[in-house]
Amino acid sequence: MSEEGPQVKIREASKDNVDFILSNVDLAMANSLRRVMIAEIPTLAIDSVEVETNTTVLADEFIAHRLGLIPLQSMDIEQLEYSRDCFCEDHCDKCSVVLTLQAFGESESTTNVYSKDLVIVSNLMGRNIGHPIIQDKEGNGVLICKLRKGQELKLTCVAKKGIAKEHAKWGPAAAIEFEYDPWNKLKHTDYWYEQDSAKEWPQSKNCEYEDPPNEGDPFDYKAQADTFYMNVESVGSIPVDQVVVRGIDTLQKKVASILLALTQMDQDKVNFASGDNNTASNMLGSNEDVMMTGAEQDPYSNASQMGNTGSGGYDNAW
């Protein structure tokens, strides 16, 4: 591993996909970045649905679940508060975005209801959030349901900020490819084969970026992976480049919180040795407070509020 520090080489980039090589880092760091990009970048998603009228063939819960999985624009999500940190009773413009949907089957044929039919009624205050992500050529978005003549669907959705650790609907990435040691020099992969592993296991496209092993070379027990091939695909709620950038930023904050806790622990030990009993008596409590600083550190603090919001047509978009 070089002492130059982490290096990134972009191999391919598009609107929804970026392929890059991350080098001069160890396996733990590369895998931490992968996990953070998958589950710890905040986005906006529909969290609860109030159904006023539903005469379709689909149950309220079924439609609520489909609504929850619709990607919503989350570019300015940092300007939105977590609902658990907001001082409002249920939801407000500072912690949520309210969308409405009203559709009626008027034609003799089937009427399709798409995510484009969702209308934002909240005051966005200039923030780029809440709009359904529409990527198809027709500009319709996600199909929510189908209506026959005379059927009606009328509902109100409340979208809130969250991370994929709470529910997959808040995940910003559709898929993340992750590979290292394509020639299997480190023997981390045990190939299963019938006759010849070289013929039955096709080579990865990443093999061309590394030298093949020489036949007869001794195995290096001290060798470690330091080059990782990653491909990130976004669902559209956040641009794919921001998925990577915000993943790095989130990982830095998590490491910083640990460093802060360790630093304070060392300071408490110094104070204890010098006879500061007040500080020493609060060592355990203060360390716990530092570790739980920030909304991202405790995504389950409102676990008791994650059930159904009550009767009267409310359903969680889970």
Swiss-Prot record:
<dbReference type="GO" id="GO:0005665">
    <property type="term" value="C:RNA polymerase II, core complex"/>
</dbReference>
<dbReference type="GO" id="GO:0005654">
    <property type="term" value="C:nucleoplasm"/>
</dbReference>
<dbReference type="GO" id="GO:0046872">
    <property type="term" value="F:metal ion binding"/>
</dbReference>
<keyword id="KW-0240">DNA-directed RNA polymerase</keyword>
<feature type="binding site">
    <location>
        <position position="86"/>
    </location>
    <ligand>
        <name>Zn(2+)</name>
    </ligand>
</feature>
<keyword id="KW-0862">Zinc</keyword>
<dbReference type="InterPro" id="IPR001514">
    <property type="entry name" value="DNA-dir_RNA_pol_30-40kDasu_CS"/>
</dbReference>
<keyword id="KW-0479">Metal-binding</keyword>
<keyword id="KW-0804">Transcription</keyword>
<feature type="modified residue" description="N-acetylserine">
    <location>
        <position position="2"/>
    </location>
</feature>
<dbReference type="InterPro" id="IPR036643">
    <property type="entry name" value="RNApol_insert_sf"/>
</dbReference>
<feature type="binding site">
    <location>
        <position position="95"/>
    </location>
    <ligand>
        <name>Zn(2+)</name>
    </ligand>
</feature>
<dbReference type="GO" id="GO:0003677">
    <property type="term" value="F:DNA binding"/>
</dbReference>
<feature type="region of interest" description="Disordered">
    <location>
        <begin position="297"/>
        <end position="318"/>
    </location>
</feature>
<dbReference type="GO" id="GO:0003899">
    <property type="term" value="F:DNA-directed RNA polymerase activity"/>
</dbReference>
<dbReference type="Pfam" id="PF01000">
    <property type="entry name" value="RNA_pol_A_bac"/>
</dbReference>
<dbReference type="GO" id="GO:0006366">
    <property type="term" value="P:transcription by RNA polymerase II"/>
</dbReference>
<feature type="binding site">
    <location>
        <position position="92"/>
    </location>
    <ligand>
        <name>Zn(2+)</name>
    </ligand>
</feature>
<dbReference type="GO" id="GO:0046983">
    <property type="term" value="F:protein dimerization activity"/>
</dbReference>
<protein>
    <recommendedName>
        <fullName>DNA-directed RNA polymerase II subunit RPB3</fullName>
    </recommendedName>
</protein>
<dbReference type="InterPro" id="IPR011263">
    <property type="entry name" value="DNA-dir_RNA_pol_RpoA/D/Rpb3"/>
</dbReference>
<comment type="subunit">
    <text>Component of the RNA polymerase II (Pol II) complex consisting of 12 subunits.</text>
</comment>
<dbReference type="GO" id="GO:0005634">
    <property type="term" value="C:nucleus"/>
</dbReference>
<dbReference type="InterPro" id="IPR036603">
    <property type="entry name" value="RBP11-like"/>
</dbReference>
<dbReference type="GO" id="GO:0006368">
    <property type="term" value="P:transcription elongation by RNA polymerase II"/>
</dbReference>
<feature type="binding site">
    <location>
        <position position="88"/>
    </location>
    <ligand>
        <name>Zn(2+)</name>
    </ligand>
</feature>
<dbReference type="InterPro" id="IPR011262">
    <property type="entry name" value="DNA-dir_RNA_pol_insert"/>
</dbReference>
<dbReference type="InterPro" id="IPR050518">
    <property type="entry name" value="Rpo3/RPB3_RNA_Pol_subunit"/>
</dbReference>
<dbReference type="GO" id="GO:0006367">
    <property type="term" value="P:transcription initiation at RNA polymerase II promoter"/>
</dbReference>
<dbReference type="GO" id="GO:0006369">
    <property type="term" value="P:termination of RNA polymerase II transcription"/>
</dbReference>
<dbReference type="Pfam" id="PF01193">
    <property type="entry name" value="RNA_pol_L"/>
</dbReference>
<dbReference type="GO" id="GO:0001172">
    <property type="term" value="P:RNA-templated transcription"/>
</dbReference>
<feature type="compositionally biased region" description="Polar residues">
    <location>
        <begin position="299"/>
        <end position="308"/>
    </location>
</feature>
<dbReference type="InterPro" id="IPR022842">
    <property type="entry name" value="RNAP_Rpo3/Rpb3/RPAC1"/>
</dbReference>
<keyword id="KW-0007">Acetylation</keyword>
<comment type="similarity">
    <text>Belongs to the archaeal Rpo3/eukaryotic RPB3 RNA polymerase subunit family.</text>
</comment>
<feature type="compositionally biased region" description="Gly residues">
    <location>
        <begin position="309"/>
        <end position="318"/>
    </location>
</feature>
<keyword id="KW-0539">Nucleus</keyword>
<comment type="function">
    <text>DNA-dependent RNA polymerase catalyzes the transcription of DNA into RNA using the four ribonucleoside triphosphates as substrates. Component of RNA polymerase II which synthesizes mRNA precursors and many functional non-coding RNAs. Pol II is the central component of the basal RNA polymerase II transcription machinery. It is composed of mobile elements that move relative to each other. RPB3 is part of the core element with the central large cleft and the clamp element that moves to open and close the cleft. Seems to be involved in transcription termination.</text>
</comment>
